[in-house]
């Protein structure tokens, strides 16, 4: 009987974790991050689920840079936004692991 109760508790915990993961994914889709380059002269905004939202370039930068430099600035801003999105995801899942006492090697994506 004890094994049945343990199994039932495990199934319940798994269902709760799955519900939490769904909520986290929704929250990440609603969370915006902004990557910046050249002190904010180039900005890329995307959701924490990596859906692009906008690209902004200060017009003065266009006058002062060539195409290759502009490409580099866009790439820097994109990488910055991606890092922020990755950090938001990591923070959300680390919090989930703590709340449900999940092991560090628990893979949320399999």
Q: What does each model-found stretch correspond to?
A:
Residues 59-62:
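A short acidic/small-residue loop/turn micro-motif
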Residues 14, 50, 74:
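Residue-level signature of catalytic and energy-coupling elements of molecular machines
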Residues 73, 77-88:
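Stable alpha-helical structural segments in soluble proteins, enriched in small hydrophobic residues
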Residues 1-30, 34, 84-110:
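Long amphipathic alpha-helical segments used for membrane anchoring, targeting, substrate engagement
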Residues 30-56, 105:
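N-terminal intrinsically disordered, cationic/polar leader segments
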Residues 68-72:
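A short, well-structured alpha-helical segment
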């Amino acid at each position: 009987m004890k094994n049945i109760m343990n199994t039932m508790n495990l199934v319940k915990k798994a269902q709760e974790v799955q519900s939490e993961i769904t909520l986290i994914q929704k929250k990440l889709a609603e969370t915006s991050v902004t990557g910046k380059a050249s002190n904010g002269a180039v900005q890329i905004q995307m959701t924490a689920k990596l859906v692009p939202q906008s690209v902004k370039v200060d017009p003065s930068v266009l006058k002062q840079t060539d195409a290759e430099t502009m490409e580099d600035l866009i790439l820097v801003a994109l990488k910055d936004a991606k890092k922020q999105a990755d950090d938001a995801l990591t923070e959300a899942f680390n919090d989930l692991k703590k709340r449900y006492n999940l092991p560090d090697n628990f893979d949320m994506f399999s």
